Structures are given as structure tokens and as C-alpha cells.
Amino acid sequence: MQAQLMVYGYNFVSELLEEKIVEQMNQYIKMDLPESYQVSKREMYADMLNGKITSMERISLLNDLSQNFGTILYTGSDPGMVPAAKAGGIVDYCQEMPQVFFRSKINLNITLRSIQSGIPLRALDIMGAGGFLMSNYQPELARQFEEGKELALYGSREELLDKTAYYLSHEKERQEIAHRGFLKVQKLFSYEMRVRKMLELANLEF
């Protein structure tokens, strides 16, 4: 898990779960699954481990950030694991969350390690609300959005801290990036555009 924590953009947890390890885990994890269940135990165990890795990563990075910058943590989980951050509690997804994204100087997205492809919904939520997005590197994010122009991506703990310090001290540039990210989401990720894309992939006319 410590090795995976150091790598961004590629997940190797499942590859390292050899059959011997899966059998050992079977002795401690009991699951009564129907025969029709299509996901292998290797994949389920990989998801479990990736969930734990993500939790460790988020707590560690949020502690680093909150010890160096003013940080508000919106969560229903125990905020005591990030003691230097201010607890913001839970906000309503439709009414309050967009305002949080828009008013925050930097919004941090730390993608679940089990999400190996695709653009995280949270990233679109943030940019769609006009907020500045700082996200871990994801291949699809890097392809669809221009780093340093429409969002900010980091590939290490050090890069996250450096870019956070930079963008907090460059307000005009930060606001311009947030606006360009907002325009890109409006252009490419509206309901109409997504429906058009789905119909196109299904070879149907709009």
C-alpha cells in the first residue's frame, strides 16, 4: 500500500494480488456471494485495498495541507483525523455544495484509487460550479482539460504543496483558470452534449 501511495496515474494493486495472497485473504474475509456474481474475489479485494489506500492518502495529504494553509474539511466522517483543518460539516449536494466550490480558493479532488479510468464526477462538479480544481493526475482529465489553463494537476505530495502555495498567491491566474475550466465543462459536458455522445456511440441519430 505504501508503494501505491507514491504512484499517480497507474494502479498495480490488483496485479500484485497473486492467487496465494487471495487464498490467504479468503481465510479472514468471509463473503457469501451468489453464483451469478460476476466480480472475482481478486477484484473485490483490490477494491478493498484501494479504498484503504485512498483513505490513508486523503488523511495524509489533508494533514500536510492544513498544517501549511487554511483548510476547511467538509465531511460527515470524524474530522479529528485532520486536527489542523476547520470542520465544515456536511453540505447539501444540490444547494450548498456548488456555493462551496465557487467560493473556495482551491478545491481538492483526490480520486478513489479504484477509479482507474474516466473523469471523476467531483472534478466536473467543481469546475461546473466555477470553482478552481486541483486534482491528482488522471489520464482522462489530462486529455480533456489543459493543465495550468483549465485546472491544476499534481503527481506527487511535493507538487501538490508547491502548486497550492503558488495558486494561493496568484489570485488573478487562479480565477482565470477556474473560468476557463467552467467554460470547458459547459461546452463539453452539458446534458445535451452527453446525450449526443451516447447516441453517437450507439449509432443512433439525435
Write out the residue ranges for each language-model feature:
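Nucleotide-sugar donor-binding catalytic core of glycosyltransferases
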Residues: 1-115, 138-141
